Amino acid sequence: MSRLRTVSGKRLEDLLAAAPDALEADREMRGQIQKGIGARWYAMIGVGVASLLRCERFVYDLRGPLEKSFAVQLAADWTKLSLTDEERAILSYTEKGTLDEASVRRRDVEPLRQAGLADKDILLIAAAIAYHNYLIRLAAAFDVMPS
């Protein structure tokens, strides 16, 4: 049960159902991001953010299509994984956008461009990072599982 008396479930969707417009907005945002960047990158960002925020208990729930062992390794130290240039750039940007978002500058986007990502992709990646930070922090605050 969440920390809200009116919410009996253990998932973020149960919590957001207390404010139906919030639930609808959350589903729409998540759907647009996943559609834009794909399930793998979306899940990698989610696992990365969970790990960076020290919410490892959410890694399994956020791993989506990722193999369990891959998600665990990603959460432990993604720099040791065999990743594409795009994935490395995305996870590096995820770190900066999660741990020190106020210091993100134009130069921090360059590795994403060098990896071949277009501005639309970069915008959606930034949205995914922000979304997962919101999702995980809200879930942790109310003791529910993110999605």
Language model: regions and residue ranges:
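Hydrophobic alpha-helical segments
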Residues: 1-147
